[in-house]
């Protein structure tokens, strides 16, 4: 089985920020809604949604403040345990 057989779409895109309130307000003006606000450790986190696009922004005060400063892209998958085994087998090749 190939890795692509497990993927179902993008889960979210992670973007760090130095000022979460300004970042949230920016995305709200673009039509996003706040799906969730929480705290992860010491970092404030917000999930912002526009249709099927979800952005996770979190305040870590270490954001690069440069174009393309995306921290991560999360992919939805089915059967993550089986996918993990497939990835491990591919790493051994």
Residue ranges and their predicted role:
Residues 1-6, 17-20, 37, 47, 73-93:
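Vicinal oxygen chelate
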Residues 47-48, 70, 77:
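Conserved short hydrophobic patches within well-ordered secondary structure
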Residues 7, 15-54:
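Core segments of cupin and vicinal oxygen chelate
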Residues 64-66:
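Short glycine/serine/proline-enriched coil/turn segments at secondary-structure junctions
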Residues 1-21, 70-73:
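N-terminal beta-strand motif that seeds the catalytic metal site of vicinal oxygen chelate
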Residues 56-58:
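Conserved beta-strand in the GNAT
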């Amino acid at each position: 089985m190939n890795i692509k057989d497990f993927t179902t779409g993008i889960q979210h895109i992670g973007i760090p920020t130095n000022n979460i309130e300004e970042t949230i307000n920016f995305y709200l003006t673009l039509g996003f809604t706040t799906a969730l606000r929480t705290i992860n450790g010491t970092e404030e986190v917000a999930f912002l949604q526009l249709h099927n696009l979800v952005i996770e922004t979190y305040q870590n005060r270490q954001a690069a403040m440069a174009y393309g400063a995306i921290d991560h892209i999360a992919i939805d998958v089915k059967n993550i345990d089986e996918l993990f085994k497939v990835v491990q087998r591919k790493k051994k090749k």
